[in-house]
């Protein structure tokens, strides 16, 4: 179990390098940058969609009848959540910095393995890209006469054009599949090599009991520190939510009382 936890941490911290095994057009992000980006996108999405749902509910017949005024408290709730995010920022930043530092050597070894395998497969990727471009050029050349013929009105029906295009498209499809199959065959040994290297690194880590225990102790220490430092932020969140919850409670009870009066008067 210890090895699994540490493995996940190391793989996450080396995620940018593994991703750039196939992509080279974007600069690598730090682990904390990736966490912040994902969290920001998720929170903003939930916030916007949540506000839309609340708005739809309040404009519905039931919402108008209950008159809970949820949107009146939405900005207050959003402000409280944003404040929590700001308070936790430095704390979680410190946690990831410590974890990244503790696993630096192992990550360097794994990144080295990735780069070595990447260098071996790059010629196959370049060759595949070249062949693919050649196929596209050939496809364009074969389509040119058909396009000209179509523009000149030689085809009276669209079905005629489809019939002439079908063999060309099937030929391109079959040739593309052949290239992909060839590339898959060429890359298979290197994929196995990469998995074997990773397995070797992890096995060495498991056999190194003292080192693994040290990593485990440091990780537990960092998590405990994170929990202690986050307590004030969550207490602030709780205090910030109290007025919102109290307002909701009052509105809801008022709506129930009004509904009960209507029932008794019928």
Curated annotation (Swiss-Prot):
Keywords of this entry: Cholesterol metabolism, HDL, Lipid metabolism, Lipid transport, Lipoprotein, Oxidation, Palmitate, Phosphoprotein, Repeat, Secreted, Signal, Steroid metabolism, Sterol metabolism, Transport
Protein name in UniProt: Apolipoprotein A-I
Methionine sulfoxide modified-residue sites: 110, 136
Function of the protein: Participates in the reverse transport of cholesterol from tissues to the liver for excretion by promoting cholesterol efflux from tissues and by acting as a cofactor for the lecithin cholesterol acyltransferase (LCAT). As part of the SPAP complex, activates spermatozoa motility.
Biological processes, Gene Ontology terms: adrenal gland development; amyloid-beta formation; blood vessel endothelial cell migration; cellular response to lipoprotein particle stimulus; cholesterol biosynthetic process; cholesterol efflux; cholesterol homeostasis; cholesterol import
Family: Belongs to the apolipoprotein A1/A4/E family.
Protein's cellular compartments: Secreted
Pfam families: Apolipoprotein
Gene from which the chain derives: APOA1
A GO cellular component annotation in the UniProt record: very-low-density lipoprotein particle
Quaternary context: Homodimer. Interacts with APOA1BP and CLU. Component of a sperm activating protein complex (SPAP), consisting of APOA1, an immunoglobulin heavy chain, an immunoglobulin light chain and albumin. Interacts with NDRG1. Interacts with SCGB3A2. Interacts with NAXE and YJEFN3.
Endpoints of the signal sequence: 1-18
Residues in Sequence repeats: 68-89, 90-111, 112-122, 123-144, 145-166, 167-188, 189-209, 210-231, 232-242, 243-266
A Gene Ontology molecular function term of the record: chemorepellent activity
Region (10 X approximate tandem repeats): 68-266
Post-translational modifications: Glycosylated.
